[in-house]
């Protein structure tokens, strides 16, 4: 009985992982700046554990957006800060897939 439950949960995890990457690639193809908000809303909707979502998000980002100068994968994040009536859009990068997705980081706090 436990074997079949474990097998079922493993199969469902694989399908969930494939579906997440499909949604991510579609969002990245449409606009790289909207891919991260799509995943944030998806994580809130599914009530998924944050570490699992960070792993799923950072894995394709690290390989799909490489830095062409020194071939170190970089993760790009789009942050929006408002001051008064004007807004300031900035694009930042980091050399590690997990450093820009840390707990309490600017990426998640600014979205």
Curated annotation (Swiss-Prot):
What is the source species? Saccharomyces cerevisiae (strain ATCC 204508 / S288c) (Baker's yeast)
Origin, by domain of life? Answer: Eukaryota
Q: What else is known?
A: Partially overlaps SSZ1.
**Residues passing through the membrane, by range:** 7-29, 49-71
Subcellular location(s): the record lists: Membrane
Gene Ontology cellular component terms for the protein in this record: membrane
> Looking at the keywords, is Membrane present?
yes
The entry's keywords:
Membrane, Transmembrane, Transmembrane helix
The protein's topology relative to the membrane is: Multi-pass membrane protein
Specify the protein name. Putative uncharacterized membrane protein YHR063W-A
